[in-house]
A protein has these predicted regions:
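Acidic, proline/glycine-enriched N-terminal capping motif
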Residues: 2-193
Length: 193
């Protein structure tokens, strides 16, 4: 099921038009809605788990002269983000928004000791050493391409268009503890119309 179809089905089950988006829902209903005064009562935080984040942006030329995304996981990633946003009851926010994401990646075997325990973390490392493992994911894909695929996935679900995003932050890091590959995403309305 595509993200657009999932969105349409979601609104039809609720008796809303597909263009109404999720406007009728308050951010307080969504999982992880912010109430701390910093993110505001309408902010929503949700988790996407089940696959590694996929970059969007690089293209491959086809023999017939056409182009396609270099990463074949872009479409499934965008659909998973959209489905999780719907499940979290992310409202369709009007006006400018801020979007933040933490992208999580599965650690390779060299981040672990022989007994299977994670090596001590060192935030300044780029790659694993014999004694320590890095915290941050300093290898491809580029964070800007991950950000692009995730922002596009939330268009018409969390905001009308990703042009409404006026700020935010993105981090890439390796999973720690029982975390699974995916992302932790927060969308914050900044008011206005």
């Amino acid at each position: 099921m595509t993200a657009a179809n999932a969105c349409r089905d979601h609104h039809q089950r609720r008796g809303e038009s597909a263009t109404a988006g999720l406007q009728g829902l308050s951010g307080g209903e969504g999982a992880g809605a912010g109430q701390d005064g910093l993110t505001g009562p309408q902010s929503v935080t949700f988790r996407v788990e089940g696959m590694a984040p996929a970059p969007q942006g690089s293209k491959d030329w086809l023999p017939n002269g056409g182009m396609r995304e270099s990463c074949r996981n872009v479409k499934p990633w965008r659909e998973l983000v959209a489905l999780e946003a719907i499940a979290a009851k992310v409202p369709l926010m009007q006006g400018p928004v801020r979007m933040s994401a933490v992208f999580l990646f599965q650690r390779p075997a060299n981040h672990y000791r022989r007994d299977g325990t994670l090596k001590p973390l060192n935030p300044s490392l780029v790659s694993a050493t014999s004694r320590e493992a890095p915290l941050f994911h300093c290898v491809k894909p580029d964070y800007s391409k991950l950000q692009r695929s995730t922002e596009d996935a939330l268009s018409r679900l969390a905001y009308e268009d990703d042009a409404r995003i006026v700020g935010g932050s993105c981090d890439k890091r390796w999973c720690v503890g029982d975390e699974r590959p995916g992302a932790l995403i927060t969308v914050i309305p900044l008011g206005g119309g």
